[in-house]
Amino acid sequence: MLRTSIATSRQLLSSPVCPKASAQWLRSSNAGRANTTTRRYYAIQQEPNGALRSSLSPSAAAVSDVSQRASNSTNTKRPNTSDLNVRSPASPSTGSTLKPETVLVAPVSPLRQGQSSPGSAAPAPEPAAAPPPSPPPPPPAPKTGRLRKFLLYLFLTTGLAYAGGVWYSLRSDNFYDFFTEYAPYGENAVIYLEERDFRNRFPNATKKNNRRAVAPRDEGAQVTIPGGSGLSWKVAEEQQEGSDISKKGPHMSAVDNNKATKDTKTVEKTKGGVTSKSPAQKEEAVMTKPAPEGVKTQPAKVAETPREPAIPAITTIDHLVLNTEDEPVVQDLVKVFNDIITVISADAPSSFSGPVAKAKEELEKIGKRILALKSDAQASAQKEINDAHASFDKSAANLIRHIDEMRAEDATKFREEFEAERERIAQSYQEKINTELQRAHEVAEQRLRNELVEQAIELNRKFLSDVKNLVEHERESRLSKLAELVSSVAELERLTAGWSDVIDINLKTQQLQVAVDAVRTTLENSNVPRPFIRELAAVKELASNDEVVSAAIDSISPVAYQRGIPSSAHLVDRFRRVATEVRKASLLPENAGITSHAASFVLNKVMLKKHGSPAGNDVESTLTRAENFLEEGNLDEAAREMNSLKGWAKLLSKDWLADVRRVLEVKQALEVIETEARLRCLQVE
């Protein structure tokens, strides 16, 4: 089917027919600028009978011939077969291997559209075969939405981490402190979950099931005084100040202040009417004596001016006084009642004196009843307290008795343990004393025995001396010759024994010298480093009692006699290779980089090698002197020269110096052993 929009149809009508057969479908270059929502593409479908059926939208315009290309009519018309050959694009042949759905629209260039004049009516020849279609454009890259995914994953990860932190905070106190301190709203979340868990576990905990219902307190109707009462603005203002019975004043106390108000209080300022008794008015009030009926009347006297009062004196009602200082509820009730009396006294005391007196009696009865109830409660409480004290005393006595019994048992147990321990210690000390006495007795007996033996020897010596003297006196000539003979024989025996020791020492010295020569021969005749553990073990066995030889052998490094030491020729050959590498790094500083290495390598090629015995501390002079010492066989001086190097030169010659040190240590130890052997020979002589 062929579907096209109005914009595409108008562009086809305004453009000439392309003379070439390569463009199968015509498309304006401006079609890309149209809205993508109204763009439609070709879709060709071949019916079984081979006829091509075109279906146009109701808003599309059909073209019947070439002369009607410039019309802008929007009427729809079904084209006939001849019109299809003129205006419709060439349909693909039935033998084509390409499917119509896979063929894309090829845009028409503006230059090719303008080549044919608008008035040209020559029909385009139908191509014999359809050209191969152009390759499809690459599909647009799909939107990855990395930022959206990143934000989504970040939000989910943060939420999971936060929920995990809240959950773990309910199980770990240390993590709870960390989480509530650093996590935002962490403490509120944890507290909310704890409260919710508590409500789930104890649903009736917040209900007031165990509390006693308190009856509402009947305070009566609230008494108010009109604000506009009085004759002048000044008195009305004072009345407004005194109308608030909740402020501090004489009416707030039902005991102390009412005792002082037994005398009659008259109104000081009659122009403003009757006001409540405030502390400022107490100073200006004039006190009068009480009347016998309980109602106190006194004509008012103005303190400020000496003129007569404009209003006649009024009577007042005495306040209620109850001796219940330690009952706050009764005090509050009396205070409220006295406030009412104050208000009534200010308005019409004579009309309410009867009910007020009756109320006073009722309140006094209530006060007495409260005092009686209080005394009964105090008596019952005191009784309970006494009973509790008695039970506590009894329990304390039982506890003290139990503690005394336990203490006595512990004391008996400790005493038995103490006696057993004391007996054990006494027995052990007795055994020690017996042992010491026995040893002292044995020592004394041995001392006495030794003294007896010494005395016997001394007596025997004296006896022999006496006998000798007697015999010499008798036989002076023969005995004297015998004594000389005995002394000569003893001297010969002594010399014989001494020479046997000398022979043994010489034999050991010779064996030691032979073992040292064997070690030296092994080291000098080996071309490669060779271990000399057996030779060194023989030397150590021959001089096992000599501390100097043992110290010399211990000074040799285990690596030296386990792996062997290089020969002098090997050291010289290795020195030459090491000297070449040291000369390459002779110009490098300690913290050299790649540039310094390259510069040192280049400059080393142009440097001249020194000969003889040059003076100086540079690397080349040191290497020359060390090489001369090696040629002379002086390893010690060569090692000293190489040890004076610094930086990279010393680092490169570190292994060679270690080998030279091991060789010097072995040679020095062998020299010490040989010297010790010679000293032995000299001591014998």
From Swiss-Prot:
Protein name per the record: MICOS complex subunit MIC60
Region (Disordered): 49-144, 209-305
Any single Gene Ontology cellular-component annotation: MICOS complex
Organism annotation: Paracoccidioides brasiliensis (strain Pb03)
Keyword vocabulary terms for this entry: Coiled coil, Membrane, Mitochondrion, Mitochondrion inner membrane, Transit peptide, Transmembrane, Transmembrane helix
Lineage of the species this protein comes from: Eukaryota, Fungi, Dikarya, Ascomycota, Pezizomycotina
Transit peptide as recorded in UniProt: 1-19
Ranges of biased composition (kind: Pro residues): 124-142
Record topological domains on the Mitochondrial intermembrane side: 170-685
This protein's record includes keyword Transmembrane: yes
Low complexity composition bias: residue spans: 51-67
Transmembrane segments annotated in the record for this chain: 150-169
Subunit structure: Component of the mitochondrial contact site and cristae organizing system (MICOS) complex.
